[in-house]
Curated annotation (Swiss-Prot):
This is Isoflavone reductase homolog 2. Transmembrane segments: none annotated. The keyword Cytoplasm applies. It comes from Pseudotsuga menziesii. NADP(+) binds at residues 5-11. It is found in: Cytoplasm. Keywords: Cytoplasm, NADP, Oxidoreductase. Belongs to the NmrA-type oxidoreductase family. Isoflavone reductase subfamily. It is an enzyme of class 1 (oxidoreductase). The keyword Cytoplasm applies. Its EC number is 1.3.1.-. One of its GO terms (molecular function) is oxidoreductase activity.
Length: 49
């Protein structure tokens, strides 16, 4: 499982999660099945763990 880690709240709105996924390298994009700790101001600053 690839997890996008940020510093916000679990369960943010789906549109924010989708926006965050767009910033992933394309080779990971289709393999993401969990996004946690998403905060709008953190979009684009995520790391793969």
């Amino acid at each position: 499982i690839l997890i996008i880690g940020g510093t916000g709240y679990i369960g943010r709105k789906v549109d924010v999660v989708i926006s965050a996924v767009k910033f992933l390298p394309s080779e990971f994009g289709n393999d993401v099945d969990r996004v946690v700790f998403v905060k709008e101001e953190d979009i684009g600053t995520f790391t793969i763990k």
